[in-house]
Structures are given as structure tokens and as C-alpha cells.
């Protein structure tokens, strides 16, 4: 659903097809807004129109076929082969509209032995190794706090659709795009994935810390947590001299360079933990900012949503809602010519 929402934010007229009677499954996920919608549903479906069609009937399939001449793109997330059984596969719809852009989203490679397996974000996070690199080393593997695989797959799908539309403008040809949650989940592992290939085994989990930059992570000041990201040796020099006022630390050869700090993190870490705990958080943030060292307060979600930074940036908008009157939605995170899209 996020793919369609991204395209809708860009101005596409998106028609969401839902099951008669019950609608989309996510209408029952999360806190309820009225009788038929939830926060989960609304977070992925703004700016869309919605219709209900029984795709199990010939009449329902005819309705979809009748819409094709006025459509540029079809996005579907049936299990592999499901759309074809209904008469809604790429080749079947291409026969009606030859220049159609058709995007199939499934759990796994459509040509592999797992093609017909259902794909859920949590399962993919486990199977793609994402849970294995998340959390503390002393704790079990941990899933992300949000449906990261679902969201990234939606974003990649939107990119692919836009690229296909651009190609069609030049060539007049449609395209079949295939997206698999597993493929996108593996992509998210990024440099951790490449590290694992070089090591021949899983890299260590570091929780809020960084595998190769020290100090970099969450620390507890006297009155609350903050994030400190010392990205290079010059910053560490300022951190020691100007922030915690301990020049002896940076003058110690064990900590003079980032390579040495990473090597000796088990010695440096407890020292910094004890030091930082003796300062008020605001004082640390002031000194860190003055020294040009990346830092920030660890905020609660509600605190972040209602902050002046969020308000000033226009990151939350209110949209009219037929039941609630108005409802909050996230604004698209980009600006075009200095303006957020409505």
C-alpha cells in the first residue's frame, strides 16, 4: 500500500480495490478511527480513492478490466500465481492495455521454490538476517520497531514504477515490475551484509553503538539519555578537551585514533559512561553543539511528534475525514521548490 500512497502524494489518481464486506485487513489493525478505519490503515492509504470488488466473480474481474483503459499502472500483492488465477495477471491485462505498467509485490522470488509462500514483514526480517543484526549482543535477535521491510519494499516499488513510466514516455512500452519482500529485506542489511560476507559469519550486534566508530551511541547523563556521535579524530579531541574537559583521554595512545578507540572500546566505554553520567544533559548538549559534534536528546515519540521542530517543518498535516472530521497524516518528507506537497 505504501507504493500507491507515494504515487498518490505525487499527484496520481490511485484507486484502491478492497474486498466487499470487510475491506482491507489493515482496517482492523491499530487504534480505530470511526467504524471502518484505523491509524494503521490511514498511515498507508491517504490520497487514495477506494472501491470494493469481488475479484472471485466474473463480474468483479470485468470491473477491473473496464478500468484498464484509463489506468497507467496496476499494483498487486497476491501470492505468486494468484492474480493469474483470477484473470488479472500481467499477460492477461497486457492484452487489454499493451503499454500497462504492472507491479507485482510478493514475499519471495516468483521463479523460485518459495514463490507461493505468503510474505509477512516479521518473517522476512527473521529470514533476511535483519533481526540478527538488531539489538544488543547479550540479548536475542530483535525485530525493528516498525515494518521496515514492508515500507522499504513500497518505496523501492514506487521508484521502479516511476522509472517504468519515464521509460514508457520515451519508448511507448509497458513493463512488468516484480518486487519481493525478501529481496528488499536483504538489501536493507547494507554494510552489515557485506561485513558478514567478508567475515564468513555474522558480525557482532552492537545495539545503540556503532561497529567501527567510538564513541557513537546512547549515553545516560545525570538527568536523561542523549545520543553522541563522534565521527572523527578531530571531533574526539574537542569532545575530550571542550565537552568532558579530560584532555588526558585523547592524549592516551589507546584512544588517539578511531582505529585504536574501536580496538579498545571495552576500556574507553566504561570511562565515558561514568564521565557523562556526571553532567546535566542540557550542558552536554550545549557543549557538544558548540564543538560541532553531532548530538541529540533521546525523545519519546509523542514528544517528537508535538515538538517545535516537527511543527515548524510542517511534517504533520490534517486532512478532512468523513467520520473523525479531521485526522493527522504525515506530510511527504521531501520539499519540491521549497514546498511540502499537500
PLM features: residue spans?
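Oxidoreductase and adenylate-handling cofactor-binding alpha/beta cores
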Residues: 154-174, 187-199, 241-250
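Short Gly/Pro-enriched turn/cap motifs at secondary-structure boundaries
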Residues: 32, 41, 206-211, 216-218, ...
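Short hydrophobic-aromatic micro-motifs
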Residues: 50-52, 124, 218, 225-230, ...
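Aromatic-enriched alpha-helical interface/lid elements that frame and gate functional surfaces
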Residues: 214-291, 295
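N-terminal helix-loop segment corresponding to the beta1-alpha1 unit
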Residues: 1-170
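Conserved Rossmann-fold dehydrogenase catalytic segment
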Residues: 110, 138-147, 169-185, 204-211, ...
Amino acid at each position: 500500500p505504501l507504493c500507491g500512497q507515494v504515487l498518490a502524494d505525487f499527484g496520481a489518481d490511485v484507486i484502491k480495490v478492497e474486498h466487499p464486506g470487510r475491506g482491507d485487513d489493515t482496517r482492523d489493525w491499530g487504534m480505530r478511527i470511526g467504524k471502518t478505519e484505523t491509524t494503521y490503515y490511514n498511515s498507508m492509504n491517504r490520497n487514495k480513492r477506494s472501491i470494493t470488488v469481488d475479484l472471485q466473480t466474473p463480474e468483479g474481474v470485468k470491473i477491473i478490466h473496464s478500468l484498464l483503459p484509463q489506468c497507467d499502472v496496476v499494483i498487486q500483492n497476491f501470492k505468486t500465481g494468484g492474480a493469474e488465477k483470477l484473470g488479472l495477471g500481467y499477460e492477461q491485462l497486457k492484452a487489454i492495455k499493451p503499454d500497462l505498467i504492472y507491479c507485482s509485490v510478493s514475499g519471495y522470488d516468483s521463479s523460485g521454490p518459495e514463490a507461493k509462500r505468503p510474505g509477512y514483514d516479521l518473517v522476512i526480517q527473521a529470514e533476511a538476517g535483519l533481526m540478527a543484526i538488531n539489538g544488543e549482543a547479550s540479548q536475542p535477535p530483535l525485530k525493528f520497531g516498525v515494518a521496515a521491510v514492508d515500507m522499504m519494499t513500497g518505496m523501492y516499488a514506487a521508484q521502479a514504477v516511476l522509472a517504468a513510466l519515464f521509460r514508457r514516455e520515451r519508448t511507448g512500452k509497458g513493463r512488468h515490475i516484480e518486487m519481493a519482500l525478501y529481496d528488499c529485506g536483504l538489501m536493507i542489511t547494507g554494510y552489515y551484509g557485506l561485513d558478514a560476507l567478508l567475515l564468513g559469519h555474522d558480525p557482532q550486534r552492537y545495539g545503540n553503538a556503532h561497529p567501527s566508530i567510538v564513541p557513537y551511541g546512547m549515553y545516560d547523563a545525570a538527568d536523561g539519555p542523549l545520543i553522541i556521535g563522534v565521527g572523527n579524530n578531530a571531533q574526539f579531541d574537542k569532545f575530550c578537551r571542550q565537552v568532558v574537559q579530560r584532555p588526558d583521554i585523547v592524549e592516551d595512545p589507546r584512544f588517539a585514533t578511531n582505529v585504536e578507540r574501536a580496538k579498545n572500546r571495552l576500556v574507553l566505554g566504561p570511562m565515558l559512561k561514568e564521565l557523562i553520567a556526571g553532567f546535566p544533559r542540557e550542558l552536554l548538549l550545549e557543549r557538544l553543539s558548540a564543538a560541532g559534534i553531532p548530538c541529540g536528546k533521546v525523545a519519546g515519540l509523542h514528544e517528537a511528534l508535538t515538538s517545535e521542530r516537527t511543527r515548524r517543518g510542517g511534517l504533520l498535516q490534517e486532512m478532512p475525514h468523513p467520520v473523525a472530521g479531521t485526522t493527522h497524516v504525515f506530510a511527504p518528507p521531501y520539499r519540491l521548490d521549497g514546498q511540502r506537497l499537500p
